[in-house]
Amino acid sequence: SLDRDSYNSGDWFNAIDFSGQFNGFGRGLPPASRNESSWAIQGPLLQDDWLRPSPEEIAAARSQALDLLRLRASTPLFSLGSTRLIQDKLTFPGAGFGAPAGVIVMLIDDTRGGHDVDPELDAVLVVINASGQTLTQPLPELVGRDFRLSPIQAEGADEVVRRTGFDRASGTISVPARTVAVLVQQSR
């Protein structure tokens, strides 16, 4: 609980409750070797029942994690396999000076580089918005492209990600705060 490195903390802290009723948070102060200087702050937090996830929150987190695993397995574009394919197909639109803090936009473009990795998709657009605000970002290089939220997320457990949008005419992406969104462009 609140240990930044619980690898060697043992089963007391790292136990798995397959019933989904408890996740171990608040079980006790983390080991002194790396954490004793923070115990005065950590102690009251660990005693606060409001900070312990409910069984419903644990189930929601599990379902959302399973959606991410399904996304990872949904297209071979997430496992290009060679340096050459990565260099050919992967770009980061909107990156660089002036890019919004806490945001990563990654485009895996299967129309580039000759070899068609996924016949079903022309591209995958991954947006990681770790900021506390909804991201609305024009990406001029994506004007005219037809990106839609992946069916896995559109039909998945996370209701927040469904507010993700892409405007084809302006190339503008909109992603809620603290959200990872995966958009796809079907093959033409």
Language-model regions, residue ranges each:
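C-terminal beta-strand-rich structural cap/linker in extracellular carbohydrate-active enzymes
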Residues: 164-188
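Loop/helix patches that line or flank the sugar-binding groove of alpha-linked glycan CAZymes
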Residues: 1-125, 130-145
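A short acidic, often aromatic-flanked loop/helix-cap motif at beta-alpha or helix-coil junctions
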Residues: 157-159, 180-181
